[in-house]
């Protein structure tokens, strides 16, 4: 079985996007914005707040603060279920 590569940044942003969790994004210049992560790629994050969209370059981001706790790692039970599914 090949070891699954774990990309923390992509996983974090994808959970925020799929669960539509509100975030505060702090930029390196001190500016901050709030909204929902709508999309992201290797270089940018698209934040939506109301009817306003903001495309932010990742190199300009200092901190992303989600409104709720994000479970990044799979629990042992989820890992076991995945292994069983792969064996079938």
From Swiss-Prot:
The keyword RNA-binding applies. RNA chaperone that binds small regulatory RNA (sRNAs) and mRNAs to facilitate mRNA translational regulation in response to envelope stress, environmental stress and changes in metabolite concentrations. Also binds with high specificity to tRNAs. HAMAP family: Hfq. GO terms for cellular component: cytosol. Gene3D superfamilies: 2.30.30.100. Residues 10-70 form the Sm domain. GO terms for molecular function: RNA binding. This is RNA-binding protein Hfq. Belongs to the Hfq family. Homohexamer. It comes from Fervidobacterium nodosum (strain ATCC 35602 / DSM 5306 / Rt17-B1). InterPro entries: Hfq, LSM_dom_sf, Sm. It comes from the Bacteria. Keywords: RNA-binding, Stress response. Pfam families: Hfq (PF17209). GO terms for biological process: regulation of DNA-templated transcription; regulation of RNA stability; regulation of translation, ncRNA-mediated. The keyword RNA-binding applies.
């Amino acid at each position: 079985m090949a070891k699954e590569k774990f990309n923390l940044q992509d996983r974090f942003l994808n959970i925020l996007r799929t669960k539509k969790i509100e975030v505060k994004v702090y930029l390196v210049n001190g500016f901050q914005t709030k909204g929902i992560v709508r999309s992201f790629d290797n270089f940018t994050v698209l934040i939506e707040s109301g009817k306003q969209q903001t495309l932010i370059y990742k190199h300009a981001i200092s901190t992303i603060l989600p409104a709720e706790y994000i479970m990044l790692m799979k629990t042992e039970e989820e890992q076991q279920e995945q292994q069983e599914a792969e064996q079938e």
